[in-house]
Amino acid sequence: MPDLLIVNKENFEEKKKQFIEGGLNKIHILSDFDRTLTKTFVNGEKTLSLISELRRRNYISEDYTKAARALADKYHPIEINTSISSSERKKAMNEWWTKHFELLIKSGLNKKHLGQIIKEGIIQIREGASELLDFLHNHNIPLVIISSAGLGSDSIFIFFQKYKRMYKNIYIISNVYEWDKNGNAKRVKEPIIHCMNKDETVVKDYPQIFKKIKDRKNVLLLGDTIDDVDMVTGFDYKTLIKIGFLNENIEANLKA
């Protein structure tokens, strides 16, 4: 496979052997969402995330779109620049999403917007992901998604519903909105999850999810940024296989 790069083939074969020997009941999947389980390009057009669709399509208002784009233009280059220290990037991401959530709520984000974005937007499930989800479901292998999605866990739930793949073995750890009786966003629960603090988003802090995976020590980790590796922080795994999707900054990410 010309598009597949295995850094250490001998090490990979040993880990694969341990996965096989342990069996399916010792495996769980830990995955990012945007551009990991979704496509990076659709019809030749680059996609970013569900929240980027909200900016792009004026679902709320032109004022929101303008302000949100200004935030993205300022902070996204910092997000993907691995030459900037982790602490600086973490601080910048926290600033970005604190401001963005305040903007979303002030601008009138409604739960109905999530359904519109997923129904009408260009974000699509990654090729092969449906088959993976079916396999995991059929063999009762837990899939834990840790996502910094700006539209939160509700949007991921609706996305999988669209593809009829919101299975009971899928567990989502993401930002959580509180909605009023009319579906308007009132606040986002703390702590805010962003791409740079997944090392602080420890699965043990979610006991209902942790009990499903605590004895499944062989972990397959899926992500599209260097920082996604931090999702496994705090989990006492036996064997870890990491799969990274090189969506952008390919040379820098390969060196890392």
Label the model's feature ranges:
Residues 1-181, 256:
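Alpha-helical substrate-recognition element adjacent to the catalytic core
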Residues 182-194:
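Short, surface-exposed amphipathic charged segments that create phosphate/polyanion-binding patches used
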Residues 193-234:
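Conserved Lys-Pro-Asp/Glu-containing loop-to-beta segment of HAD-superfamily phosphomonoesterases
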Residues 27, 169-170, 217-219, 240:
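Residue-level recognition of the N-termini of beta-strands and the immediately preceding loop/turn
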Residues 134-143, 212-217, 238-239:
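Short, surface-exposed connector motifs at secondary-structure boundaries
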Residues 145-152, 218-256:
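Acidic, Mg2+-coordinating phosphoryl-transfer loop and its flanking beta/alpha structural elements
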Residues 173-176, 189, 246:
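Residues at the C-termini of beta-strands that transition into short coil/loop
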Residues 12, 129, 205-206, 225-228, ...:
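Amphipathic coiled-coil/heptad-repeat helices and related helical stalk/stem segments
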